[in-house]
Amino acid sequence: DEVDAETLAHAGLVQYAVIFDRIFRFAITGTRVRNYDAVGGQLLFAWLHQHGVLHWTDTSLAFDWDGVAEQVIALSDKINDLYWRSIDRPKMAHWLAAYELVRSTLTPHPASVWAQGLPTEVLAGAPSGYTNAVLDDEFPLSMFFEALEKKMRPVIASTEGIRG
């Protein structure tokens, strides 16, 4: 009917909006201190790039839109499986599994204690030891995001205080 046709006409635009919002907004506008929304955007960007549906050169960003949905679903399946398995394991083991999922796509900070392997005293201790070992910027921005942030910094600064 007419409502379904209108909804379908806008569905593709919603896909673009969600992808661009997730990839760009938090990664370059937020603080780097334990900014997990930014890590989510970085993860999505890297996943799409590593699975051949996002392509970046020094001056051009392109998407293979026909393959994007399939790859977003594949990443979602990995995350859903992580959460599904969480019911069968202790919290700290789940945290380690979550870290490995992110680390399988994003490169952790070279000084990361998590990436090097948490010491036995942390592994055997309270959950606070795990969270205290996380660096403020555990997964630093990639070169793509560094270059984008540098180019966008003046634009972002010019919008400070604007409310809509």
What positions do the PLM features span?
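Long, well-structured alpha-helical subdomains associated
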Residues: 2-118
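Accessible peptide chain termini
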Residues: 1-2, 164
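Extended, compositionally biased alpha-helical segments that mediate assembly or anchoring
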Residues: 84-164
